[in-house]
Amino acid sequence: METWSFPDGNIANLVERRQIFDSHQDVNQRLQAHSSLMQRLALDKEMEGHQGCVNAIAWNSKGSLLISGSDDTRINIWSYSDRGLLNSIETGHSANIFCTKFVPETSDELIVSGAGDAEVRLFSLSHLSRKRSEEVAIEPVAAYKCHSRRVKKLAVEAGNPNVIWSASEDGTLRQHDLREVSSCPSAESSNQECRSVLLDLRRGAKKSLADPPKYCLVLKSCDISPTRPHQLLVGGSDAFARLYDRRMLPPLSSAQMRMKSPPCVNYFCPVHLSEHRRSSLHLTHVTFSPNGEEVLLSYSGEHVYLMDVNCDDKSIMRYTAADVPKHFCLARISGESKLPLPPAVPSSYQLMHRLDVYRNLVQAAARILEEGSNIYYGIEACNEVIDGKGPEVGHSVRHECLCIRAALLLKRKWKNDVYMAMRDCNSARKINASSFKAHYYMSEALLQLGKLNEALEFAEVAGNLASSTCEEEMVATIKGHLVAAEAERVKKDNEDTVRSETRHGKLRSLSDVLFRAELNSPYSESRYEREDSDYEEEMELDFETSISGDEGRDTESSILRGSLNLRFHRRDDSARESSSIDGAEGSPSSSSQNYYHTLQPEVAIDMKRRYIGHCNVGTDIKQASFLGQQGAFVASGSDDGRWFIWEKRSGRLVKMLAGDESVVNCIQCHPFDCAVATSGIDNTIKMWTPHAQVPSMVAGGIAGPETADVWGAIEINQRKLCRNRELVLPYEFLERIRMHEFAEGTLHPFECAQS
């Protein structure tokens, strides 16, 4: 297959430019994550020192030290220069460490950790010996016990040694000022009045953009903008990342009274996920780009998405709940005419050569569509033309490329490919409102989504636009598929009606199962407020035991066969909403708070790029990170033990590396050098540097050279994402199962896969 170059140029020319023009800073930043170096990344060192999964890694500001936290409740400090272990600190945490960082501007003497025991601990390294591999237990200089659930992420502000932010699954983000109290009572304490709550989101989650926030937002991640430190980004148990301006938030409060969630500056969510009401859809990581202009979101059971922070009111990336149905509607582009061609491109050899490359890529993609093989390559070729950094290709070529990519996406059928195809069809219709291909492929996409009426409307228009016998036959075929799909839907509706009648009377409350074990648990009442039934979304449980071997799962999922069959049915939300709103609730004394809350935006920012290839379903700490000071590349861990690197601008896959025996969770790029640290389920940290002899798309880890077929590995990951499991449990339910031991004999043993 034909390959095409990256836009960052020849690395030798960059080095020469640095020597001639002495522009060290800019060139060094471009060199750090140059495409030729990314393609040469290989395992440099496997760093041993932990006895459990390594859940957190972070660099100090100079890049001389790496800190890590693990399930073994230890914090390790590593030397970057020789990859050696300097100190191993017994923290005193009673559960897994999920996050740890160096506190800025403290000469790397203060470190902070957050763990599954709901505590944030601060340690001073000033009295530690620099003797290597010294294992020591030191007392924390500060211990904050005010969270009631696991602390999943910490954030610090560059240049600020006084404040730490912690995000917890209890739905609060707290601000700890190190100049004030050095400790606080635990959340179970009757005198817990620690006023450190910056964001109270225990009623901040929403099922869709149109819904009011009323459920507990179980926080999984947070970040502070590196260029605008007043900007705070959080993500958790729904589809929406939220951007807040710390200057506009209410004063710090205690957790004794629940506050209405404050309005955010922006929501971030791909438009096709904004109306999904699946309780399993949630964010595992959110982060700012190095320049603070973009954010990266990683979803469980989904892909990684890039979005712009600064979108003005007229930006096409902004949308409201009312805009979502328009993406499926024929009238969305009505009245638009074909756009005028752009002005002529200046004639030069380089520009003409680049345009020739683009035309060749479009032709190659068209051949792939016709042949039906190498679909992934065809899509990436279209990505390069549509999203690449180059001269304007002209509306005609762009329209053709959009239609080809839409057709390839519909043929590939990976998760949410159908929504990406719809985006391309709508973009093509903006260029040419009379495009047969755009309307035909839109009809096919809507058919795949089961939106049969809308699909028929587009098929009718495509039939009117057909200019050949072949196109007329295509329309007739898809209309036949629509008729068959409608008949199948009617049949299924009738069967579902009969089945629902036979199930009547089998329901038990899920909260009965969960809270029965809680009554005798140390986590009951005082630790988790009874009001927190929002956490389970008050689902109903259809509880049936089954021992039939016919109900076994896919062998890849490693789930026990038929031991438990759980089906969930939601209650009517209307009763919940009224009880939630009418219940006791704290609020600021000023009456302006109610007015302020009514202005909570229902505007969200849509995606501008999707990164696909990895699998994120097994853990809720999986990161997606920018690589390099300019953030030109994006990386993510995966459940298959690999980690993936994409070019940020186009989404093009650059590298796939085998980094773990099971799962890669954490990826952190060195502040200045071309070096990347990764960790996961293994008890080691891997350091990756560009020392491979030749560039390649794959690289091995500790098991030796990676020889796996790239597209085959990605295909397996996508099947895992798309697998239609009969048993899909809300992860909140699984957390309760994990945290509470049921009385012996109460329930039969069973295993569940985290969704």
Residue ranges with predicted function:
Residues 28-52, 82, 137-139, 267-271, ...:
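A short helix->beta-strand "capping" segment at the edge of beta-propeller domains
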Residues 63-67, 86-87, 107-112, 121, ...:
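Structural hallmark of WD40 beta-propellers
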Residues 57-63, 101-108, 155-161, 223-229, ...:
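Loop/turn segments within WD40 beta-propeller blades
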Residues 2-12, 16, 192-212, 217, ...:
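Terminal intrinsically disordered, low-complexity extensions flanking WD-repeat/beta-propeller proteins
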Residues 366-431:
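Alpha-helical adaptor scaffolds
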Residues 52-55, 72-76, 95, 116-121, ...:
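Short coil/turn segments within WD40 beta-propeller repeats
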Residues 75-80, 120-126, 132, 154, ...:
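WD40-repeat beta-propellers
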